[in-house]
Amino acid sequence: MISANDPKALCDSINAARDAGTKVVTFDSDTDPSCRDLFINQATAEGIAQVQVDMIADQIGDSGEVAILSAAANATNQNAWIDMMKETLAADHPDIELVDVVYGDDDDQKSFDATAALLADHPNLKGIISPTTVGIAAAARYLSTSDAKGKVALTGLGTPNQMRDYVEDGTVTEFALWNPGDLGYLAAFAAKALVDGDITGEEGDTFTAGDLGDFEVGADATVLLGDPFKFNADNIGDFNF
């Protein structure tokens, strides 16, 4: 089981393993579909993009300049989400202007510095979307001690444990994520189903993933975990991951 930061870079190694009889399951961030047997998708690109756009629109009054702080420029999942966010903003939020997309390479300090640069380069910035757990935490850390705290909204994808302090101190109002434990749990059951021969990765194959219930393989040998979940001051204390 692997999560890929580049859709092509691992394909030669993966295909060598598959030729030797190894079943390959990707999760979180996919390779090219031809390089693996199954992809466990935490949510659809459309769903992840939509929830982040909805949150930032709500937090900035559906008007003003926003920017995106992403991970690596070639990260498969990030780019899919960003493309969908651009489409959703253009179609449904004409008064929101996406002024920049920057990359922190999932490095805390680089993401922290990129946040500072965004605020310096765009003095009228009203919001930042960071669809990466490293990026959103670094951006929150910067905003929490800056004059922009409470003035520039921050949302995206994060974990409750890393974001709890920033929600409680008012730096962040709301963010989203799937349950990573459930994602790994589903990936493990899917891999076992492949190895046992219960499924082949064909569209329409079904299997049971323990306490999560039954799942069906969709197009491009993809299995969908579900919809993203929003975390805020009302519920963040209920989670510990």
Question: Model-derived features: where do they sit?
Answer:
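Short beta-strand segments enriched in small/hydrophobic residues
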Residues: A4, L38-F39, E65-N74
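Short, solvent-exposed amphipathic alpha-helices that sit
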Residues: I48-Q52, T76-I96, K110, A114, ...
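Hinge/cleft segment of the Venus flytrap/periplasmic-binding protein
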Residues: A73-N77, T88-D95, A190-F241
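Hydrophobic alpha-helical
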Residues: I2-D19, M85, G104-Y166
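Short beta-strand elements in bilobed, periplasmic/extracellular small-molecule ligand-binding domains
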Residues: C35, E65-I68, A90-D108
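Exported/periplasmic ABC-transporter solute-binding proteins
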Residues: K126-S130, A140-G213, D220
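Flexible loop/hinge segments that line or gate small-molecule binding clefts
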Residues: L10-G47, E65, P160-E168, V172-T173
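Hydrophobic alpha-helical segments within soluble ligand-binding/sensing domains
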Residues: I40-V66, A80, K110-F112, T159-M163, ...
